C-alpha cells in the first residue's frame, strides 16, 4: 500500500470537503491541488467522483431530518410535494444543458485563464449581491425554502448552470443567484444544499458510467480514504457555514475568490505552476 498516495488522497478529500459547499469553487481548487500533488491523471477523474460522493453523504446527513420528513409527508402533504417539485424543477436545467454542452465546456473552458477569471468575476458578483441586499432589505421576499414558487426554483436552477464554467462554484451560483432573486441568505443557502443532492448524485452517476473502464479494485483504498476525509470535512464545513451565515455575509468569500484568482493567473503566466486543466 502506497502511504504517500493515501496521504495525497486524504488531502484531495479535504480540499473537496472544504470547498464543495462554500461559494469558492471546488473544481478550481481540485484542479490546482491535483496539479500540485500529481493527481491529475485519468484515474483522477474517477477519484473526483469518489470524494464528491463523500460530500453528498455529508449534506444528506446534515439535512436528514428535513429530507426524511419530506419523504414521509410526500404522498399526502402539499407543502412536501411543492418543495420536492421545486427541487426537481431546479435540477432539470443542469441535466439538459450538461448533456448538451458539458463535453464542449470541458474541452475548451478548463484553462487557467478561464478558471481564474471566473474566480475574480464571481467575487465581484458576490460583493454586488451582498451590498444590494444590505442597501435594500425589502428586496428579500423569501425567508424559507417552503415559500419558494416553481418559478423561483427554475431561476435558481438556471443560475446553477453557470457553474458548468470551471471556477464559478455551484454553491456560489445557486446561493448568490437565489439572493439576487429575493431569497434571504439562509433560504438561498438551504435550497442550494438541497439542490446539491440530486445534482451531485446525477453528475457522479453519469461520470462514473462514462469512466467505468478506469475503475480498478487496486484503487479502492485510495478512493475510500478520499471519500471518508471528504465526508467528515464537508460535514464540518456545512455545519460551520450554517452557523456563520446567521450573523455574517459572504463578503469574506468574495475577497478570497478575487485574491485566489489573481494568484492563479500569476502562477500560470509566470510558469510557477503548470496547470493540468
Curated annotation (Swiss-Prot):
GO terms for molecular function: undecaprenyl-diphosphatase activity. Pfam families: BacA (PF02673). Its EC number is 3.6.1.27. It catalyses: di-trans,octa-cis-undecaprenyl diphosphate + H2O = di-trans,octa-cis-undecaprenyl phosphate + phosphate + H(+). The keyword Acyltransferase does not apply. One of its GO terms (biological process) is regulation of cell shape. It is a multi-pass membrane protein. GO terms for cellular component: plasma membrane. The keyword Membrane applies. Its main location: membrane. Keywords: Antibiotic resistance, Cell inner membrane, Cell membrane, Cell shape, Cell wall biogenesis/degradation, Hydrolase, Membrane, Peptidoglycan synthesis, Transmembrane, Transmembrane helix. The chain crosses the membrane at residues 3-23, 43-63, 85-105, 109-129, 189-209, 218-238, 249-269. Bacitracin is thought to be involved in the inhibition of peptidoglycan synthesis by sequestering undecaprenyl diphosphate, thereby reducing the pool of lipid carrier available. Catalyzes the dephosphorylation of undecaprenyl diphosphate (UPP). Confers resistance to bacitracin. Belongs to the UppP family. PANTHER family: UNDECAPRENYL-DIPHOSPHATASE. NCBIfam families: PRK00281.1-2 (NF001389), PRK00281.1-4 (NF001390), undec_PP_bacA (TIGR00753). This is Undecaprenyl-diphosphatase. It comes from Albidiferax ferrireducens (strain ATCC BAA-621 / DSM 15236 / T118) (Rhodoferax ferrireducens).
Amino acid at each position: 500500500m502506497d502511504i504517500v498516495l493515501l496521504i495525497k488522497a486524504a488531502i484531495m478529500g479535504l480540499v473537496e470537503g472544504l470547498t464543495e459547499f462554500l461559494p469558492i469553487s471546488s473544481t478550481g481548487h481540485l484542479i490546482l491541488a491535483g496539479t500540485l500533488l500529481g493527481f491529475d491523471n485519468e484515474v483522477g477523474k474517477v477519484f473526483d467522483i469518489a470524494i464528491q460522493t463523500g460530500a453528498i453523504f455529508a449534506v444528506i446527513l446534515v439535512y436528514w431530518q428535513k429530507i426524511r420528513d419530506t419523504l414521509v409527508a410526500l404522498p399526502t402533504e402539499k407543502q412536501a410535494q411543492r418543495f420536492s417539485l421545486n427541487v426537481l424543477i431546479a435540477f432539470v436545467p443542469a441535466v439538459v444543458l450538461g448533456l448538451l454542452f458539458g463535453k464542449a465546456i470541458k474541452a475548451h473552458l478548463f484553462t487557467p485563464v478561464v478558471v481564474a477569471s471566473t474566480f475574480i468575476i464571481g467575487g465581484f458578483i458576490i460583493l454586488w449581491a451582498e451590498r444590494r441586499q444590505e442597501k435594500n432589505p425589502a428586496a428579500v421576499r423569501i425567508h424559507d425554502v417552503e415559500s419558494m414558487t416553481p418559478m423561483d426554483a427554475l431561476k435558481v436552477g438556471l443560475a446553477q448552470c453557470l457553474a458548468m464554467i470551471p471556477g464559478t462554484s455551484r454553491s456560489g451560483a445557486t446561493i448568490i443567484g437565489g439572493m439576487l432573486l429575493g431569497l434571504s441568505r439562509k433560504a438561498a443557502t438551504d435550497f442550494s444544499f438541497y439542490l446539491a443532492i440530486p445534482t451531485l448524485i446525477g453528475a457522479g452517476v453519469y461520470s462514473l458510467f462514462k469512466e467505468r473502464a478506469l475503475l480498478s479494485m487496486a484503487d479502492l483504498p485510495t478512493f475510500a480514504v478520499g471519500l471518508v476525509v471528504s465526508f467528515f470535512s464537508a460535514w464540518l464545513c456545512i455545519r460551520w457555514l450554517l452557523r456563520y451565515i446567521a450573523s455574517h455575509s459572504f463578503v469574506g468569500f468574495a475577497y478570497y475568490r478575487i485574491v485566489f484568482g489573481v494568484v492563479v493567473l500569476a502562477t500560470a503566466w509566470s510558469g510557477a505552476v503548470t496547470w493540468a486543466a
